[in-house]
């Protein structure tokens, strides 16, 4: 016997509680599939969902049985004021990464024709957000993954930024042109290898390992970026790195030991966690 649409929603709510899933995901799924927000669903009664019942049930079943993130199931993620294409080739953009964009935009507003680098661009979220906030800036978005660059390219095209954001394939600074940049930004892999197995299944099973695993202490990529960034920054340019909770003091120490950098500070995210480490390049290093 076919389950009525309103019965499906009640069952989904019960399953969400059992699997420790935020009930808001159900309304997010409903709105994405039907175009109806929670109020319109309530006003429309059971018939509001009936035409979409089978699709809703199938997607929710995958959410439960495969621990598949809803953003991957739907192919989109809402972040800042953006609706971004995503798939398992890229990380799902997190709210904490918004602080990285804010740092870049605040600094680059005073730079005429700002030149910004986004290392490990993934979905292109940071590059797109910075470019939209700074119409006069040029952004170079770098990633080693061809599959990730396809996703980033779709998001750049979606927001009409193809002339402003340049995609480059390669490891970190390797594919960049030889010119000084105003800002180098990165949300690199920063989770210690030993902690990967303890991640939530939504992350561990579906998000790209190469974008998560930061080596034994989580800072392999951070060290490499610090080593190379100074020679790509203009004097007074900034390096801004997103880090894991608790890594801030160690990254500050790494930068403090490098004479090419100064004025090191940390920026807290929306949850009050030291999430971004920012430093200035004293001079272009060798």
Curated annotation (Swiss-Prot):
Record: residues binding substrate: 187-190
Catalysed reaction, written as an equation: L-glutaminyl-[peptide chain release factor] + S-adenosyl-L-methionine = N(5)-methyl-L-glutaminyl-[peptide chain release factor] + S-adenosyl-L-homocysteine + H(+)
Pfam families xrefs: MTS, PrmC_N
Family annotation (CDD domains): AdoMet_MTases
InterPro entries: DNA_methylase_N6_adenine_CS, HemK-like, PrmC_N, RF_glutamine_MTase_cyano, RF_methyltr_PrmC, SAM-dependent_MTases_sf, Small_mtfrase_dom
Entry-linked SUPFAM superfamilies: S-adenosyl-L-methionine-dependent methyltransferases
E.C. number(s) listed in UniProt: 2.1.1.297
Any one GO biological process: methylation
Domain of life: Bacteria
Disulfide bond residue pairs: none
Function per UniProt: Methylates the class 1 translation termination release factors RF1/PrfA and RF2/PrfB on the glutamine residue of the universally conserved GGQ motif.
Family in the record: Belongs to the protein N5-glutamine methyltransferase family. PrmC subfamily.
Name of the molecule in the record: Release factor glutamine methyltransferase
Lineage start: Bacteria, Bacillati, Cyanobacteriota, Cyanophyceae, Gloeobacterales
């Amino acid at each position: 016997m076919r389950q009525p649409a309103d019965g499906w929603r009640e069952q989904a709510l019960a399953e969400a509680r059992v699997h420790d899933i935020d009930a808001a995901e159900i309304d997010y799924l409903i709105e994405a599939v039907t175009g109806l927000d929670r109020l319109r669903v309530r006003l429309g009664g059971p018939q509001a969902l009936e035409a979409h019942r089978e699709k809703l049930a199938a997607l929710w079943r995958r959410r439960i049985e495969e621990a598949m993130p809803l953003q991957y199931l739907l192919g989109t993620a809402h972040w800042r004021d953006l609706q971004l294409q995503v798939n398992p080739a890229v990380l799902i953009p997190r709210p904490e990464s918004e602080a990285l964009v804010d740092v870049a935009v605040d600094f680059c507003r005073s730079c005429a024709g700002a030149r910004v680098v986004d290392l490990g661009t993934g979905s292109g979220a940071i590059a797109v957000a910075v470019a939209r906030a700074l119409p006069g800036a040029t952004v170079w978005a770098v990633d080693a993954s061809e599959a990730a660059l396809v996703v980033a390219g779709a998001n750049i095209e979606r927001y009409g930024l193809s002339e402003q954001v340049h995609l480059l394939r390669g490891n970190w600074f390797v594919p960049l042109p030889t010119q000084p940049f105003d800002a180098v930004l990165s949300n690199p892999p920063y989770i210690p290898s030993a902690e990967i197995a303890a991640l939530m299944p939504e992350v561990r099973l579906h998000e790209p390992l190469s974008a998560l695993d930061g080596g034994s202490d989580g800072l392999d990529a951070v060290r490499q970026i610090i080593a190379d960034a100074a020679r790509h920054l203009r004097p007074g340019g900034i390096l801004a790195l997103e880090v894991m909770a608790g890594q801030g003091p160690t990254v500050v120490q790494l930068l403090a030991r490098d004479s090419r950098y100064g004025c090191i500070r940390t920026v807290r995210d929306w949850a009050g966690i030291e999430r971004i480490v920012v430093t200035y390049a004293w001079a272009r290093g060798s």
